[in-house]
């Protein structure tokens, strides 16, 4: 099987994960009503998903990687299917939290393994596009899977939407188990090596900026329905989630091409983060004009999803051991940020904050990420200039992808 077809199978798995992760925002009111809890409390099921996603990659990947990348992917999909079936069957709030946590752990294992497999299956000059396709599969879940799931939920209840997601997981499982070729992945880094990557200043900056971006973007997305209802008087959020998802697909796919052509993932990342802050700040004001709210939504989706590609690209370099550890941490930061954002958003709403103010708070967090990037990266450059040599993290893993994009040779992961 060619590399492109194999990457497409990984994108199918990402599609199932994306549908699961992002459909929940539209299902929270129905879930809360069925289980007799508030929307903000039901939203903590998203926190459970994202928190376990964040913890799964560093805690379990080092052990499971001994089985091989393909086996890790299949295992993650099996757990994902069982967890979503459990969510569909649960009759208690505790059961909801437990099954969502299990689904999040499965997604946390699948996503970094899929990213690592994607770059191992294609030539170096196509790695940006391969990453974009895998991540685009997840954002495609928001365009096709989320609206379809919400329509099914409107007609047959929220549990039917979870059964649909379970079926998507089964399809992805059959495809990956039956057709994905063996993948030559990196040697599994130890837990100490994974967290030790944070001692590298450049890796730490990339991971910290990713964290701020997802606190803002994913945290706000969890409560998109009450936000849109407050700022624009919108009832059904299905078409608006669809617009957000279309932006996400376009952003994911275009970002990979931009990274490959420009060779400047760091510059692209900070530009995207600044644009995200502007789009979120515009959201409350755009809601006052009919139809205008679509503009910040599509921009938010596009730049939010596009941001992941240059960040991952900066961490996947010729030092496969360091790159795998850094990518796992970055994936963890992505969903840890979502968990923190969801938890803080739910807490704010539970304490009476006007839902229309949430986008402004999220915009402030995004701007803090821009400030962090603009101050930390030049400081590291000055440090390198003083010492007369690049920092270790620039030579190994974090900056290696930048060198590759600029034309330096890069080898496949051993």
List PLM regions with ranges:
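Cytoplasmic helix-loop-helix junction between adjacent transmembrane helices
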Residues: 93, 99-138
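Conserved MFS/SLC helix-loop-helix module at the cytosolic interface between two early adjacent transmembrane helices
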Residues: 55-91
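Helix-to-loop junctions at the C-terminal end of transmembrane segments
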Residues: 56-69, 251-264, 349-350
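Helix-breaking motifs and short loop linkers at transmembrane-helix boundaries and internal kinks
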Residues: 34-36, 68, 89-95, 263, ...
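Paired small-residue
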Residues: 83-86, 94-103, 291-299
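A late C-terminal transmembrane helix in Major Facilitator Superfamily
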Residues: 318-354, 362
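C-terminal transmembrane helical hairpin of 12-TM major facilitator-type secondary transporters
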Residues: 266-310
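C-terminal membrane-cytosol helix-exit motif in multi-pass small-molecule transporters
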Residues: 166-186, 372-376
């Amino acid at each position: 099987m060619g590399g492109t077809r194999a990457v497409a199978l990984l994108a199918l798995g990402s599609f199932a994960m994306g549908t699961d992760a992002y459909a929940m925002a539209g299902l929270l009111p129905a879930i809360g009503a069925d289980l007799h809890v508030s929307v903000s409390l039901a939203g903590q099921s998203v926190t459970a998903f994202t928190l376990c996603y964040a913890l799964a990659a560093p805690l379990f990947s080092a052990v499971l990687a001994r089985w091989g990348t393909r086996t890790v992917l299949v295992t993650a999909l099996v757990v994902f299917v069982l967890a979503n079936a459990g969510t569909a069957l649960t009759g208690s709030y505790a059961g909801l939290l437990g099954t969502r946590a299990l689904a999040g752990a499965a997604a946390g294992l699948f996503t970094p393994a899929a990213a690592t497999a994607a770059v191992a299956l294609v030539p170096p000059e196509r790695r940006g596009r391969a990453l974009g396709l895998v991540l685009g599969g997840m954002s495609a879940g928001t365009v096709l899977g989320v609206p379809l799931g919400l329509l099914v939920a409107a007609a047959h209840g929220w549990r039917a939407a979870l059964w649909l997601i379970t079926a998507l997981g089964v399809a992805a499982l059959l495809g990956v188990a039956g057709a994905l070729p063996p993948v030559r992945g990196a040697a599994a880094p130890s837990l100490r090596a994974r967290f030790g990557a944070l001692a590298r200043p450049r890796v730490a900056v990339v991971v910290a900026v990713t964290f701020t971006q997802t606190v803002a973007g994913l945290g706000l997305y969890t409560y998109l329905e009450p936000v849109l209802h407050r700022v624009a008087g919108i009832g059904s959020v299905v078409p608006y989630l669809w617009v957000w998802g279309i932006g996400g697909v376009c952003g994911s796919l275009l970002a990979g091409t931009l990274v490959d052509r420009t060779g400047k993932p760091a510059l692209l990342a900070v530009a995207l983060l600044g644009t995200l802050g502007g789009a979120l700040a515009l959201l409350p004001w755009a809601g006052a004009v009919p139809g205008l709210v679509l503009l910040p939504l599509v921009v938010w989706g596009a730049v939010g999803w596009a941001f992941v590609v240059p960040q991952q690209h900066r961490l996947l370099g010729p030092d496969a051991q360091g790159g795998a550890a850094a990518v796992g941490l970055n994936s963890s930061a992505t969903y840890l940020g979502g968990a923190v954002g969801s938890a803080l958003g739910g807490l704010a709403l539970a304490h009476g904050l006007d839902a229309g103010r949430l986008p402004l708070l999220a915009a402030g967090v995004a701007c803090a990420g821009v400030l962090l990037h603009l101050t930390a990266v030049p400081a590291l450059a000055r440090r390198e200039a003083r010492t007369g040599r690049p920092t270790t993290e620039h030579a190994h893993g974090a900056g290696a992808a930048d060198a590759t994009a600029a034309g330096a040779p890069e080898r496949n992961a051993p």
